[in-house]
Design a protein with these regions (language model features):
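Histidine-dependent nucleotide/RNA phosphoesterase domain, centered on the 2H-phosphoesterase fold
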Residues: 1-189
């Protein structure tokens, strides 16, 4: 039986933007919410979660990533605003939104999806909504207080950055959190 690895495809976020998001995390932490925070170095823009795949498929996936990257130019984005999925009544994920060339980002993700279908990865069922996960909410939370925090930090904004690379990551789940390793990194354009 072939060895499997847990994988996803994402855009790496520059350290300057990560630093701003870390400041935002710290400000929200000060409000005392019970949130399992994503370590700053693990914040990324997921394009496609692949899950557990056979190691033997990595080369084919890398080719699909390369093909996708060739078809798209770098994208200008910024982190902007915050919110929760699926909604304020039952929040599970606390995220930072994006602004900028969002149409180009959706086209990039759609192309990636199409290039992976031939490798038996199903198309995403939900429409793509680019975001940066900051934390996961596991327990009940005071939704009024959370709503107030979302309003208080709604004007959060980073500087503009260029999303210029697509990366295939391996994700290892450990007791202290996920550890991400770059397997393939390809420039857009």
């Amino acid at each position: 039986m072939s060895k499997t690895v847990r994988t996803f495809i994402a855009i790496e976020i520059p350290k300057t933007v990560i630093s701003k998001i870390r400041e935002l995390q710290d400000a929200i932490k000060a409000s005392g919410f019970k949130i399992r925070w994503v370590r700053a170095e693990n914040i990324h823009l997921t394009l496609k979660f692949l899950g557990d795949i056979e190691e033997s498929k990595i080369v084919e996936i890398a080719e699909a990533v390369s093909k996708t990257a060739e078809e798209h130019s770098p994208i200008s984005l910024k982190a902007k605003g915050i919110g929760v999925f699926p909604g304020i009544k039952r929040p599970r994920v606390l995220w930072v939104g994006l602004a900028g060339q969002l149409e180009a980002l959706v086209k990039l993700q759609t192309t990636l999806d199409e290039n992976l279908i031939v490798l038996d990865f199903p198309r995403e069922k939900r429409p793509f909504k680019g975001h940066l996960t900051m934390g996961r909410i596991k327990d009940r939370i005071d939704v009024k207080k959370l709503g107030d925090a979302l309003i208080a930090f709604r004007r959060f904004e980073s500087e503009t950055f260029t999303a210029g690379r697509i990366i295939l990551y391996k994700s290892e789940l450990t007791p202290s959190g996920a550890v991400y390793t770059k397997l393939v990194s390809v420039s857009l354009g």
